Structure formats: C-alpha cells, structure tokens
Amino acid sequence: ATLHRMTRSSYPDACRRRSQASLPLFLALLLSALLPVAAHAWGPKGHRLVAGLASGELTPQARAEVARLLRGEAEPTLAGVSNWADDLREHDPNLGKRSARWHYVDLAEDDCRYRPRAHCRDGDCVIEAIIRQRGLLADRRQPDAVRAQALKFLVHFVGDAHQPLHAGYARDRGGNTIQIQLDGKGTNLHRLWDGEVIASADMNERRYLRHLQRMPLPAQARIGIDDPAAWAEASCQFVLRDGFYPAHAKIEPAYFSRWRPTADAQLRIAGHRLAALLNDALKTGAGKP
C-alpha cells in the first residue's frame, strides 16, 4: 500500500473556495487549525474499553494486585483510571507537561520503522514510556504510590500505542494539521480518530464492550506481545494505507464504515496486550533482580 499524501490542492474545501462554504464554516476550519490540539487517543470511551477488555483477561493474582494498588481511587478499576494520564494537565499540570510526549511516537514516513535515536530522544515517547512504567510496576521494592502511578500510566499508554495517529508522522503532527469537515463543522483527522470513529458505532460503553469481547482475537495480537515498538510500528502501517488520509475534506459515512472495523480490532488487540503486560508484571517475582 502507498500513503495517500494530501496537499492543500487535494481539497475543494471551505478554506480554499469560500464560494462553496459559509463564513462560519470557514472560520471554524481556520480556528481548528490555529488552536492547540489535545492528544486524547481513542477518547475517554475508547480508553475505558481497552481497560475493560484487559480486566476480563487478568489472572487472579494480577486482579488482586490491581485492586490493592488502586484502593482509594474514586473508581478503583482499570477503566476508572484509564483516562488519568490525559487528565493530568488539570489535576497535576507539572506531571502533565513532563509526560506530554509519552503519549505518542513520530515514526519514519513511508516505512514506519522505529529508530530510537531519531524518534525517541531522551526516552520521551510512548514506546519507552511503556517500558519504563512496566519496570516500575513490576518492581516490588518501589513504594505503592509509585507502582500505582505506573499502573495508571500503563493502562492509558498501551491504548495510545494502538491508535494509528499516535504512531504517525511529525510532518502533520499525527494528523492534527489535516483539516476536515464533519457534519458541517471544522475539525482535524487526529480528533476524528480520537473519538468520532468510535462514536460512529452508536453504542454505549457497556454494549460496545460486549461487542468487542465477542470479536475473535485478531491473529496479530499475539505478535510482539511484549514489544511496544512492534505495536507502534503495526499501528503506523494503517496510516500508510490508501484511504486512511481522506481524499476530500468532507468526511462521509463511508469513511467510518471502512475504518471502524480497524479501530475495533485495534481496541481488541490493545486490551489483550494490556492484560498480558499486567499479568506478567504482577506475577510473583516479576520485579526481582
């Protein structure tokens, strides 16, 4: 597959042809291009779904340790803490700023190969963040507060690594600079994948979780089960496919019909891999030198 590269000339959109759009739409598109964009991979619902899937695959030992570490949380479950890392900017701005680059990785264009020196300087990317936090969680010598924080980071970051645009390209800031129109409003491709692709299924969280649990586990879920770099590289491969970058600014229902099955599969895989990671990190002796 080849990457469909978009340019401004690709779009007969509101920003380029004012005669074809209303002024409010033009201003909405312009505003969305200028404002900073939060990187909430999958959105709150998607992260809760990944966590819910993982919870169903925990070993009794891992489940007990998760419950112990999360004791005192408002919702002491994996789903309940699955968006904690995104909420840091509100309840702990310093940690939120320090961890901002841990949610994604910008990979090499056209081949999606991860090269640590080029793509993760100082270890500030989702791949190395997962490796670090897994080590902290597994280390029983660490204080419970440190291990609980590592658990909350992991629940979120594993989901992030499976959202294709969190393993995309620096050139377009993971789709943030790709301006699109959805239901007459301006947004961007990253935001579309953060929430609207999942929302297009029109299912509440409980129903969506059952839907994903009934899905056969994709074969690729067992590949690189403990290799976050492989997860990100596989996520990036979707960005390379024809049609991932829409041919026109206006998003039609056909886009969701084509790509929602991919999103569902990625959520299913993320839940399975998160469970495998937690089961391994929380087994007896996992953190011993």
Each model region followed by its residue ranges:
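N-terminal secretory signal peptides that target proteins for export/translocation
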Residues: A1-S19
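Structural motif marking the loop-to-transmembrane transition
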Residues: S19-S22, R147
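Bacterial N-terminal signal peptides
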Residues: S22-P36
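N-terminal, motif-rich segments that launch catalysis or mediate targeting to/interaction with membranes
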Residues: H40-F157, P164-P289
